[in-house]
């Protein structure tokens, strides 16, 4: 099937680009057929926004969880109330930076694979800052210390150290 594009004026919409698919026998439609098609298409396109809003999926964590038989007040169904309840669920306490609490520099521990292996995965990759709970500066210094220990041959590169605490 071949398609052609027709610009047709629609009321209060400007020009609408319509894709018309020719029939299987590949005959051209007359002008009156195109006008009827474009009028029907413009009526359908005026409802598109409404249909899109109705069909939009609201995430489950933003909708109130009310089941049959529950007693609720209208305030429980407000968006702000539901959002506040869900934010409380996802809250995680901030982890403390262990190097900052003892006021030490992670670079001082590059010769100690037991301490450094706490910040390495089983496959030898340096854990990200979200997992370690370190500040950005100490995470940077720690990764530098781990790389230095690997270059010196103190720590393995492809797996976690056998002599680690964990």
Swiss-Prot record:
Alphabetical list of InterPro entries matching this protein: Ribosomal_bS18, Ribosomal_bS18_sf
Bridged cysteine pairs (disulfide): none
One example of a Gene Ontology biological process annotation: translation
Gene Ontology cellular component terms for the protein in this record: mitochondrial small ribosomal subunit; mitochondrion
Mitochondrion keyword on record: yes
Transit peptide interval: 1-31
Biased composition (Basic and acidic residues): 30-42
Keyword terms: Mitochondrion, Ribonucleoprotein, Ribosomal protein, Transit peptide
Pfam families recorded: Ribosomal_S18
Region of interest (Disordered), residue spans: 29-48
Keyword Transit peptide annotated: yes
Cell compartment(s), UniProt: Mitochondrion
Molecular functions (GO terms): small ribosomal subunit rRNA binding; structural constituent of ribosome
Oligomeric form and interacting partners: Component of the mitochondrial small ribosomal subunit (mt-SSU). Mature yeast 74S mitochondrial ribosomes consist of a small (37S) and a large (54S) subunit. The 37S small subunit contains a 15S ribosomal RNA (15S mt-rRNA) and at least 32 different proteins. The 54S large subunit contains a 21S rRNA (21S mt-rRNA) and at least 45 different proteins.
The family this protein is said to belong to: Belongs to the bacterial ribosomal protein bS18 family.
Biological role: Component of the mitochondrial ribosome (mitoribosome), a dedicated translation machinery responsible for the synthesis of mitochondrial genome-encoded proteins, including at least some of the essential transmembrane subunits of the mitochondrial respiratory chain. The mitoribosomes are attached to the mitochondrial inner membrane and translation products are cotranslationally integrated into the membrane.
Name of the protein this chain belongs to: Small ribosomal subunit protein bS18m
Organism of this sequence: Schizosaccharomyces pombe (strain 972 / ATCC 24843)
Lineage, top ranks: Eukaryota, Fungi, Dikarya, Ascomycota, Taphrinomycotina
